[in-house]
Amino acid sequence: MSSGTKHTMEELLRRKAKKITDPAGREVRILEDAEATALAHHCRSSRHAVYEKAMALGICPFRYLRNRDIVSIEEQLRLAKSRVVVIGAGGLGGHVVLLLARMGIGHLIVVDYDRFDETNLNRQALSTSASLGRSKSQTAVEAIGAINPGVEATPYEIKLDATNAFQILDGADAVVDALDNVPDRLLLEKATKKLGIPLVHGALAGFEGQVMTIFPEDPGLRYLYGKGGSRIDKSKSPESVMGVPTFTPALIATLQAMEVLKIILGRGRIFRNAMLYVDMETGRISEFSFENR
């Protein structure tokens, strides 16, 4: 985009921004979705670029108005500039990408080689009768675009492995583990540690689930699976043995998305060297600390 176009976009944003009174009675400048779309077309730019420029000028995209009391416009801009990779677009990952898209994460990369089948319909947010047989990663990206065109989303319809992990993960501010087996999680953890990227782990089985955030210098999944985790038979995973009902992925994915938010904004208490464990059937929520172990 030329400097002249940038100047034009800034001028148009100031002109198109509306002053409204928010639900708390405060005056705020907002940019409505239709105006953002028209401006992106006029400037031959993306909706993402328009939102970023608007927030840099203190103009709140109308879709983020209800975020303002808990997330400042400066923090919302930081989210828009962030890049998050979600590995897996099934039970956990499908919910995670939708939540992060609504929150305004600027760049989402979705990695999943699988396709939807009927057994996914009970729990996976992106699974519908219409999506059966379709690529999970591609379906996720289409859903992200429908929810928030201000998010730049990229699908990878491949299985993450040692040959492609670094290329896919490089440059991310956070990576979400939405996998369903231990060997793949350990491979992912190894790659994120080498790249210096925080990893948000999530796992579930039955009505139980867990969340933990792993920074590069942390022992991480060794706390949970020991040193022999890579030899665990995928067919004997808790998910395979106990099944995964409807509610568990939605809750654990929400906790994972919140960990991503805390990492990017540098606020709140992250579950680092600690695991949050939830048993939805009993209503028990526990935290296990791994400090000094």
Q: In which residue ranges do the predicted regions lie?
A:
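E1/E1-like adenylate-forming module used to activate ubiquitin-like modifiers
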Residues: S2-A34, P155, L160-D161, F166-Q167, ...
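N-terminal charged helix/coil linker that caps or initiates catalytic domains
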Residues: S2-V84
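Glycine-rich phosphate-binding loop and adjoining beta1-alpha1-beta2 segment
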Residues: Y51-E52, V111-N148
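Glycine-rich adenosine-cofactor-binding loop
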Residues: L77-R115, A253
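Hydrophobic residues within alpha-helices
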Residues: V96-V97, A140, L188
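S-adenosyl-L-methionine
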Residues: E142-A162
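Conserved anion/nucleotide-ligand pocket segment
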Residues: P238-L276
